[in-house]
Amino acid sequence: METKQLGTTEQDLALAGELLRQGQLVAFPTETVYGLGADALNETAVAQIYAAKGRPSDNPLIVHVAEKADIAPLVREIPEKAKKLFDRFFPGPLTVILPKSDKIGKVVSGGLDTVAVRMPENPVAHRLLQLAGVPVAAPSANTSGLPSPTRAKYVQEDMNGKIAAIVDGGDCAYGVESTVITLATPTPTLLRPGAVTKEMLEAEIGPIAVAPAVLEKMADGETAASPGMKYKHYAPKAQVILVNGDSAAYAAFVNSQPGCYALCYEEDRVTVPKVPYGKATDDLSQARELFDALRRLDELGAKKVYARMPRKTGVGMAVYNRLIRAAAFRILDLTRPFLIGVTGPTGAGKGYVCRLLAQAGLHPVDCDRVYGQLTVPGAPLLQDLSLIHISE
């Protein structure tokens, strides 16, 4: 298949809209990431999204609309809290989940009885939706599991030859996918963090819950209520390990790891190859640059990456949510002491190894020396252990 490379002229957007109406796939920019769109009311077209991305069929899609009035036919009802969110955040980087109407098929909803709706604020996306004249189901326009594309060139790398057209609208403003909140539960629940933060949502509709899978691995057998919850996402080809620690501890650790790359803040001083993802005090810049940084790590041929852990509040929660999945939930916590026992015959280099481990911020223990102390009657270490375990 030849993939048309389109710009943002009225003629190009009209062609893209016509392709969508014909049941074909079109990638287009939004303020969050590039989306891979199909007519949401055409299940044959929607099924092509899953095939092009290699996406599991139980991973629901978000339906994009041009106007607020386009939402009503897609849902069974619009509760008062939804109206408040629409008034405050639509158009914008927020997705709201509501009970679906019969117009939305199970292919779009991932087999659920709900639908996720969003009205993007990106002017190119908005005009395309107007010209298409249909609601558009669109996940991120990347191969499933890889970092979401924030530039058209990354869409081309993943989707060229698989879809009808790519609309190049430049870089995405926010850089991470939309916030997702469900109102189909007794308590409104945040399912995916984004640029619209938990605090901003609560200012409009009161307290909301945060789904455990936002910050942790989803339980086996649990049904994904939102895109991005269940499967490994956002990951480069390299192995990523998330590192929790302050700037000094992080730098000391990564500088002792030969052959690794550092995915960190601009201010972090490291001697290993470094790919920054924003400033330490600016979580909006972290969100905007994260996926581009993950893609660059692949371009550089990185094999192992130690990523600096962001904070978990505000937009930082969105950055953490993406990074923890890119790392397949691997975390190295430098705030907890790591005790590493070292043993071996005299002359084996235990002292040298202990010094290297200490430089990495770890806590080596010469096990042979400890054992030697424990065999001496009345040794201070033996007395200390006796006091600790006196009841035994």
Place the predicted regions along the sequence by residue:
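ATP-binding Walker
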Residues: A348
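Short beta-strand-centered segment that lines the nucleotide-binding/catalytic pocket of NTP-utilizing
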Residues: P364-T375
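Walker A/P-loop
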Residues: G351
